[in-house]
């Protein structure tokens, strides 16, 4: 009997130790998971729709005060831009205090962030969307290759948008520029125009459409991102335009751009002329941009963002004549790529000026209430040739804007210009 009691004591003791070890392990796992979650969120941030905002109206003032202090302490460009942060605070603070609805707060904070005049400054407020972007030509907006969602709502290719919620397009774009984050006035105007199918607060929008001689009014529900399908394009596209001209579209600087480039580049690298297209490239990794640039330069040069990164021509670097197509959607890492290409002296730029912001070290910040924002933190600087890395779009050698006539007839104005230039028959624009 005594032996049995002793045995049970040993069993219970061992069981207790096992339970304790398991509890400690579980606690460690929970702590690790929590730490990892917080670490990941500190990098990526948390996005909120207007109806998900983790704030009550009585917290708006305190949260905005934190946002403003984060900006004052960390935003690296406001002095160069001539912004008086105290004056900016005095403009927004009473408006924030008067806000009683989440929609009011979201729009005011976004307006404040946009007032910082930086392309890489943003709030983490999600927009309702139709997963579509209009084609902007001068001050006119058109439907170009509509996605399934737009087609189901009655939109057709080449439709011209003339009004949003009854407001003429030019007026609507001007009124909404105050919410557009951009480093140049032209970029803010362009981003406002491109945002007609997105909204922080509206979930049903009316569009007046001109189709031939007909005028239509179409209603379009805007939905959460996870409720609409995005038509993704490849990172790199290559094609042979004719027996002497190759075409290479680089649509992102994010993975898998290098892998797709390695597959596509050899299919056009043997041709005497090559058109490289970054008009739809919104950026990604500047390191990838630097690697890609090495395929199009003919002598070593310093990377525009670094005093130590030397660009060396790749072993199989292109030996023919390179034309680089740029536009207002060329942004961030695509702009540092464009700047390196232009300053190489080996590449001819055609198209429209870029957005005007290579990045300036954007970082994410969070208030104690859980509201996230992103702002540039690196001091203003210039390339090794003296071009500002933020605040000025890169102007092509040949400024060639799109024309409505070419768009309506399915012609690419800028590619056609390059082809005529190669043939020696182009005229100045």
List where the protein language model places each region.
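Low-complexity, Gly/Ser/Thr/Pro-rich intrinsically disordered linker/tail segments
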Residues: 396-429
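Flexible, low-complexity junctional segments that flank or bridge functional domains
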Residues: 2-273, 280-282, 424-429
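Hydrophobic, well-ordered secondary-structure elements that form the walls
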Residues: 341, 386, 418
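C-terminal regions of proteins
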Residues: 307, 350, 354-400
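Long, folded non-catalytic interaction modules
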Residues: 108, 288, 295-296, 371-376
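Short, surface-exposed linear segments at secondary-structure transitions and domain or protein termini
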Residues: 224-236, 384-387, 400, 404-409
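Cleft-lining beta-strand/loop regions that shape enzyme active-site pockets
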Residues: 201-366
């Amino acid at each position: 009997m005594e032996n049995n009691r002793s045995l049970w004591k040993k069993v219970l003791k061992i069981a207790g130790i096992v339970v304790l070890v398991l509890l400690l392990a579980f606690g460690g796992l929970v702590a690790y998971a929590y730490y990892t979650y917080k670490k990941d969120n500190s990098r990526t941030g948390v996005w909120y729709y207007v109806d998900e905002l983790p704030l009550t109206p009585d917290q708006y003032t305190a949260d905005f005060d934190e946002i403003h202090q984060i900006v004052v302490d960390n935003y690296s460009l406001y002095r160069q831009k001539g912004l008086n942060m105290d004056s900016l605070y005095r403009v927004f603070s009473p408006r924030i205090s008067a806000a009683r609805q989440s929609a009011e707060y979201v729009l005011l904070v976004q307006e404040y962030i946009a007032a910082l005049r930086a392309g890489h400054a943003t709030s983490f407020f999600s927009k309702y969307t139709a997963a579509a972007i209009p084609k902007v030509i001068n001050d006119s907006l058109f439907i170009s290759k509509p996605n399934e969602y737009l087609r189901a709502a009655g939109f057709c290719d080449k439709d011209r948008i003339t009004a949003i919620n009854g407001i003429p397009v030019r007026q609507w774009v001007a009124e909404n520029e105050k919410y557009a984050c951009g480093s140049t006035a032209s970029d803010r105007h362009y981003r406002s125009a491109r945002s007609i199918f997105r909204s922080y607060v509206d979930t049903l929008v009316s569009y007046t459409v001109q189709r031939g001689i007909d005028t239509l009014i179409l209603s379009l529900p805007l939905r959460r991102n996870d409720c609409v399908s995005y038509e993704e394009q490849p990172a790199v596209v290559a094609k042979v335009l004719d027996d002497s001209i190759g075409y290479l579209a680089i649509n992102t600087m994010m993975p898998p751009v290098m892998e797709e480039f390695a597959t596509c580049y050899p299919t056009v690298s043997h041709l005497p002329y090559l058109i490289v297209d970054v008009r739809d490239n919104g950026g990604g990794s500047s390191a990838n941009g630097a690697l890609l640039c090495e395929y199009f330069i003919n002598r070593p040069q310093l990377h525009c963002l670094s005093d130590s990164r030397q660009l060396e021509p790749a072993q199989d670097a292109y030996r023919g004549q390179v034309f680089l197509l740029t536009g207002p959607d060329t942004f961030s890492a695509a702009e540092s790529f464009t700047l390196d290409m232009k300053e190489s002296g080996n590449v001819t730029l055609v198209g429209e000026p870029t957005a005007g912001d290579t990045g300036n070290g954007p970082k994410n910040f969070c208030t104690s209430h859980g509201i996230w924002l992103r702002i540039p933190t690196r001091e203003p600087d210039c390339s090794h040739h003296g071009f500002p890395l933020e605040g000025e779009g890169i102007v092509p050698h040949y400024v060639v804007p799109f024309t409505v006539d070419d768009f309506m007839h399915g012609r690419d104005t800028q590619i056609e210009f390059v082809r005529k230039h190669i043939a020696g028959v182009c005229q100045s624009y």
